[in-house]
């Protein structure tokens, strides 16, 4: 089995662009992303033509992470890390960080750092990352934003002399490779201007300056192997009892430019449970397809508020399905769409579906008070789901507060998070089904 993780010393260090480059030069790549992000997997899929899967111990459990990683492995698995290598939910080393995932799965780590404003000191940085947790196999480094091959040679000599870690190459500074940031991290792949041109430049830089044969050797020789007959590639026992429970049922999923944030494992799990999946566009279609359940995921409805607001036929179709008693699950952007309206930053309000009695007020700042991983408890204060919140909006004009589920943070903070009126479940949390099977049973 060939696999490696590309992890950074911090956010903004260039691991996403270098991950994209490496995914473009290897054949039949299985891409993965540590953490709950939806944006980077979209880039992975654009580049490789294969689905990208999230690896998140908090939301999926250890068995869920193992299952997804082994099940979806192709010729070579490339895992893109999140934030800095050791950054996670707390300051422990078992904190759902990139290092934690790499150690748990037994994959080597290639560390990305930049070469700006340093020379020999770069070795101290690598040594610190190597020594903090010796159980993490840091097998090589790639240096980003290097001014010249001569400068790289200085870095390489210092790192290999003082740390014993191999230098695998470098990427030169190039302003043409900049990709603007938005919300969760990066623009969606379809929105990046001249993305193919940027990738072509990046691919050429990688082919010139990075030792791909050595990376493939590391991926092949230093990854823990597994037996295909092991239970590791079977669904986790805690969700396997739901297999085929919903055979004959149809779930309609919103999928278009406004709604695209779904975990691939969630969609496949719906099929595993027996659902037939149908897709529809709240932007362009006039009605929801014939179904038993409606699922509206996250995205950027605020960017398409006028178009969504003008599609009254779709509003009527969703309301009709609700009145017929069909269950509706809406996450973040989907929840915003079901509200009474979206108020843009400049003050204009666009009418939405009107099933959730509130208005969503867009802001230009991330709502830090509601940011990050959460447990979701029911009215009896029993955990039934795990997810995360990340939104640039707040609620206003809540006419009737029907929130019946509570978000619980690790530091003890709580808040009501999911509106539940009859057969409607709508709120900001993004939920991973592997850690939310009790919630799934209630909703589905």
Swiss-Prot record:
The a and c carboxylates of cobyrinate are activated for nucleophilic attack via formation of a phosphorylated intermediate by ATP. CbiA catalyzes first the amidation of the c-carboxylate, and then that of the a-carboxylate. Keywords: ATP-binding, Cobalamin biosynthesis, Glutamine amidotransferase, Ligase, Magnesium, Nucleotide-binding. It catalyses: cob(II)yrinate + 2 L-glutamine + 2 ATP + 2 H2O = cob(II)yrinate a,c diamide + 2 L-glutamate + 2 ADP + 2 phosphate + 2 H(+). The keyword ATP-binding applies. This is Cobyrinate a,c-diamide synthase. The record marks 430 as: Increases nucleophilicity of active site Cys. Catalyzes the ATP-dependent amidation of the two carboxylate groups at positions a and c of cobyrinate, using either L-glutamine or ammonia as the nitrogen source. Residues 250-438 form the GATase cobBQ-type domain. Comprises of two domains. The C-terminal domain contains the binding site for glutamine and catalyzes the hydrolysis of this substrate to glutamate and ammonia. The N-terminal domain is anticipated to bind ATP and cobyrinate and catalyzes the ultimate synthesis of the diamide product. The ammonia produced via the glutaminase domain is probably translocated to the adjacent domain via a molecular tunnel, where it reacts with an activated intermediate. Belongs to the CobB/CbiA family.
């Amino acid at each position: 089995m060939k696999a490696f993780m590309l992890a950074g010393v911090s956010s903004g260090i260039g691991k996403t662009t270098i991950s994209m480059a490496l995914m473009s030069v290897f054949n039949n790549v299985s891409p993965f992303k540590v953490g709950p992000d939806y944006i980077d997997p979209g880039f992975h899929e654009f580049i490789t033509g294969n689905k990208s899967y999230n690896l998140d111990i908090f939301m999926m459990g250890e068995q869920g992470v193992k299952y997804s990683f082994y099940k979806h492995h192709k010729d070579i698995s490339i895992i893109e890390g999140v934030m800095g290598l050791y950054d996670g939910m707390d300051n422990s080393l078992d904190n759902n960080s990139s290092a934690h995932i790499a150690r748990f799965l037994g994959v080597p780590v290639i560390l990305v750092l930049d070469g700006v404003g340093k020379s020999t000191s770069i070795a101290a940085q690598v040594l610190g990352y190597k020594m903090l947790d010796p159980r993490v196999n840091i097998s090589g480094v790639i240096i980003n934003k290097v001014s010249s091959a001569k400068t790289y040679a200085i870095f390489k000599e210092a790192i290999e002399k003082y740390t014993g870690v191999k230098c695998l190459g470098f990427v030169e500074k190039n302003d043409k490779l900049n990709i603007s940031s938005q919300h969760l991290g990066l623009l969606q792949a379809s929105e990046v201007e001249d993305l193919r041109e940027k990738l072509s430049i990046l691919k050429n830089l990688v082919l010139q300056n990075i030792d791909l044969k050595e990376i493939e050797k590391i991926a092949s020789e230093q990854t823990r192997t597994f037996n295909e007959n092991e239970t590791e590639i079977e669904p986790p026992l805690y969700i396997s009892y739901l297999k085929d429970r919903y055979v004959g049922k149809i779930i309609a999923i919103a999928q278009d430019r406004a709604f695209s944030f779904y975990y691939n494992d969630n969609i496949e799990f719906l099929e595993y449970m027996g659902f037939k999946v149908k897709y529809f566009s709240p932007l362009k279609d006039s009605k929801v397809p014939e179904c038993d359940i409606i699922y509206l995921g996250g995205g950027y409805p605020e960017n398409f508020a006028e178009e969504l607001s003008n599609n009254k036929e779709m509003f009527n179709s969703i309301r009709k399905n609700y009145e017929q008693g069909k269950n509706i699950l809406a996450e973040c952007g989907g929840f915003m769409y079901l509200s009474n309206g979206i108020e843009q930053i400049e003050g204009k309000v666009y009418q939405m579906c009107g099933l959730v009695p509130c208005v969503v007020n867009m802001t230009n700042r991330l709502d830090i008070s509601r940011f990050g991983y959460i447990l979701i408890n029911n009215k009896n204060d029993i955990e039934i789901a795990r997810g995360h919140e990340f939104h640039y909006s707040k609620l206003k004009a809540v006419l009737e507060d029907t929130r019946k589920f509570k978000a619980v943070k690790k530091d003890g903070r709580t808040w009501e998070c999911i509106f539940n009126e009859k057969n409607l479940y709508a709120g900001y949390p993004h939920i991973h089904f592997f850690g939310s099977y009790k919630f799934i049973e209630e909703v589905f």
